[in-house]
Amino acid sequence: MKRAFIMVLDSFGIGATEDAERFGDVGADTLGHIAEACAKGEADNGRKGPLNLPNLTRLGLAKAHEGSTGFIPAGMDGNAEVIGAYAWAHEMSSGKDTPSGHWEIAGVPVLFEWGYFSDHENSFPQELLDKLVERANLPGYLGNCHSSGTVILDQLGEEHMKTGKPIFYTSADSVFQIACHEETFGLDKLYELCEIAREELTNGGYNIGRVIARPFIGDKAGNFQRTGNRHDLAVEPPAPTVLQKLVDEKHGQVVSVGKIADIYANCGITKKVKATGLDALFDATIKEMKEAGDNTIVFTNFVDFDSSWGHRRDVAGYAVGLELFDRRLPELMSLLRDDDILILTADHGCDPTWTGTDHTREHIPVLVYGPKVKPGSLGHRETFADIGQTLAKYFGTSDMEYGKAMF
C-alpha cells in the first residue's frame, strides 16, 4: 500500500536563494531570524527562550538550514540524531508566490511571468473596475491600492459597512483581493463578485494568478477580524501535476486539507476538507490519514505561518506556531505504515523580520520520513519539482517533465 502525506508549512523558508538579489531578498532567512530572535529573548510573547523544535530537528530541519546557509539556527541542536532524509530546495519558478511554489512542488514550475498590479495607488485599470461595478451592480468600490489585509480593514472597513462598496486591493503578488463584511455585504455575494473578477481578469488577459475573497467580521476599526471563509480562485496549472497523474493514471485519491484545492483550481483533487487554524488543520489531517487507502495523497497547507505571522511580521507568533506544530508532529509520524512517506516542506519564505510585508525568496526545507526512508542528507535540490518527481516514481505514474527523484 502506497500513501504519501504532504505538509506545507506555508512560508517557512530556510535562507535566501542564490537569485535572491533579483527580489531584494539577500539575507532573508525565515527560520534563522526567528531562531535568532528567540535565542536573544526577543520573542517571549506567549512563549519563552530559544526556539524549541526537537521533532523537526530529528527530521533534519537544522541540518537542512545549515546546508542552505552554512550554519545551524541559533539555539537549535546541530548534533541531534537525524531520523529522516532532508534537503534544501531552490525555486525554479519565476515568482515567490503561493501558486508558483505549490505547482512546482507538484512537478509543474511556473516558467512564465505572472501579471502584476505594480502601482501602489490607483492599482487597477479603470476598464476592469468599470466592468466589475457594472456586472456586479456595485455602488462603487474602495481601496484600489496596495495594502496589508489587516491594515486596510482598519482604514476602510467602517466605510465599507456604511456604503456597501467592496474593498479592492493587491500586493507584490499576482493577486486581486476583495474584502467584504460577511454579514452586511454577505458571503455568497462576495463569492459571486470574486467569480466575476476571475472571469474579467482571465478574459482581459491580465494573467493574474489568484482572486482572493477576504471576508471579515466586526463592527468598527480595531475589532475587524478576517474569518476562515477565505476563498482563492486560481488559474489552472499549465500542465498535469503529479496529483492529476495519480488520479488519472492510478485511479488514486488526493485529499486537500485547507486551501490546497483552491491553489490547484481543484485540478487533481478528489476530496476537499476545510479547516481553520493550526490545531484544526492538524485534527483534519489526522482524520484523513487514518482513513486513507492505497494510492492516496493527503495534502495539507498550514496557512497561518504565512497569513497570521509571516505577512504580519509577528516573530513571536510564528515561533509559537512552529512550536505547536512540532509538539503535534509525533501524532502524524505515529500513523505511518511500512510503505508510507511523510514530506514536510514549504512554498516560499516570509521572513517576519524582513522589511515590508511580502514573501521572501528562500530555499525551502524538504524533510522526508517513513519506515523505509533512509535517513541522511539529500543535498541541495535545484527545483521544488524534485518533490513531484519523487512522488511520481513512488506511485509509479508517468514521469514529470521537471525535477529529479530524490530517492
Curated annotation (Swiss-Prot):
Under the heading InterPro entries, the entry gives: Alkaline_phosphatase_core_sf, DeoB, Metalloenzyme, Phosphopentomutase_DeoB_cap_sf
| EC number of the protein | 5.4.2.7
Cofactor(s) annotated in UniProt? Mn(2+)
Q: What class of enzyme is it?
A: isomerase
Write out the annotated subcellular location.
Cytoplasm
List GO BP terms, alphabetically. Answer: 2-deoxyribose 1-phosphate catabolic process; 5-phosphoribose 1-diphosphate biosynthetic process; metabolic compound salvage; nucleotide metabolic process
Major place of residence: cytoplasm
Q: How is the cofactor bound?
A: Binds 2 manganese ions.
GO molecular-function annotation terms?
A: magnesium ion binding; manganese ion binding; phosphopentomutase activity
Instruction: List positions binding Mn(2+) 1.
Output: 10, 347-348
> Which Gene3D superfamilies does this one have?
Alkaline Phosphatase, subunit A, Phosphopentomutase
The protein's role, per its UniProt record: Isomerase that catalyzes the conversion of deoxy-ribose 1-phosphate (dRib-1-P) and ribose 1-phosphate (Rib-1-P) to deoxy-ribose 5-phosphate (dRib-5-P) and ribose 5-phosphate (Rib-5-P), respectively.
Q: What is this protein called?
A: Phosphopentomutase
Organism of provenance = Shigella sonnei (strain Ss046)
